[in-house]
């Protein structure tokens, strides 16, 4: 939602952007950016991507809209690897995909609200949405709450949002986190993430008595698809 950046990284080597882009300001409150990417791979595969982003700021509100058109001819090996967890109707892959998203952020004192909704058009339309709130009651104390929903047919190779899987697909859940940094030389954090097929709970403490000394301890419990794992890590 920020338009073009000097340095960025997206996905793997296949999903990276290689091309040109430009950004223009529309007064002091808005800017528009656009880009075009062309990538040729071995085995006669190629990928064309064109996109546009418009972002506007007004007092404490920021809104943005992004549209991307992706036309590609992936290799058969990439299709099989990229779609092995997708619904059967999508395993053939698509040569053309449209992505449209809108986002908004609002700050009210100690509360920061944000959200984003997007749709993807491939063999079927899919929708995804994520919204969250960050509350800072006092300095160095942060509370975070997030809710997400990704439909089974949503597909976006460029997205990198909160998800229990590597791909944003067929999931809905809630996340609550706390960070507490008011103790001298200590950084404490914890979170709980619950989705339809599992959950994850984590507690972490970092002790930094000196600039070149760091002690780190983390405890995590995770259940995913009826498989439960426990982990305890201690680093010095």
Show which residues each predicted segment covers.
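Signature for the C-terminal beta-barrel architecture of outer-membrane proteins
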Residues: 3-236
């Amino acid at each position: 939602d920020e338009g073009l950046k000097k340095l960025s990284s997206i996905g793997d080597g296949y999903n990276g952007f290689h091309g040109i882009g430009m950004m223009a300001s529309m007064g002091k409150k808005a800017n528009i950016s656009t880009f075009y990417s062309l990538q040729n791979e071995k085995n006669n595969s190629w990928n064309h991507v064109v996109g546009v982003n418009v972002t506007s700021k007004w007092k404490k509100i920021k809104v943005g809209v992004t549209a991307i058109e992706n036309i590609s001819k992936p290799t058969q090996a990439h299709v099989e690897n990229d779609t092995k967890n997708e619904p059967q109707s999508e395993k053939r892959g698509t040569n053309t995909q449209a992505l449209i998203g809108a986002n908004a952020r609002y700050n009210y004192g100690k509360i920061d609200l944000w959200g984003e909704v997007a749709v993807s058009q491939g063999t079927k339309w899919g929708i995804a949405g994520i919204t969250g709130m960050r509350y800072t009651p006092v300095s160095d104390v942060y509370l975070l709450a997030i809710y997400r929903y990704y439909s089974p047919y949503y597909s976006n190779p460029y997205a990198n949002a909160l998800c229990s899987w590597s791909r944003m697909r067929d999931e809905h859940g809630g996340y609550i986190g706390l960070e507490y940094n008011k103790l001298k030389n200590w950084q404490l954090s914890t979170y709980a993430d619950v989705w339809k097929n599992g959950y994850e709970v984590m507690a972490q403490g970092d002790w930094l008595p000196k600039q070149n000394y760091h002690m780190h301890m983390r405890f995590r419990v995770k259940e995913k698809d009826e498989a439960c794992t426990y982990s305890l890590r201690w680093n010095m």
